Amino acid sequence: MSAELEGVRVLIITSNSGVERDEIAVPRDRLRARGAHVTHAAVEEIDVHTYRHDLIPSETLRPDAALADVDPGAFDVLVIPGGTVNADKLRTDVGARELVRSVAAAGRPIAAICHGPWLLVEAAVVADRTLTSYPSLRTDLLNAGAAWVDEPVVRSDGDGWTLITSRNPDDLPDFVDAIAAELSVRTS
């Protein structure tokens, strides 16, 4: 294990179903390998069912906490995985929306991949930002006042916080590297 991100606290949030497996597992495992402490919080502190490509059942994960029980101020970055069902459920969760607003207001980075930016739309934090996502979210993001680009990873600064976005599981290496780079700058 590397000490590159030693002392850094990462919060990954999900619903309890429909999470794209690699979009939670890869950031969790790779950020831990770099020394970060990673906490997974779900809407409920019950099993989280993951899938591959939204359709193929995969692992069942046990979250570390329920969303309502985490203090967003205790973390250095918020990570939002995709999965169509996961993102759709998260964006309708009042606690998830409030958590996003709290993290942004505190000036901490938020990283979202694939369908994860749907939650950012509902939390009203994407206006005047440039970001990427799964292509089917493009219209929703544009309607929310964001600029959308088709790139593996996009970093966007504004309103005192940084937003990092990626399109899909193929972009995970770039996504994780961008998160690690942002955290390295903040902790150096």
Describe the predicted segments one by one.
Residues M1-A106, I110, W118-T130, R138-S188:
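Extended, subdomain-level signal for the structured scaffold at the beginning of enzyme domains
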Residues C114:
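Catalytic nucleophile serine of serine hydrolases
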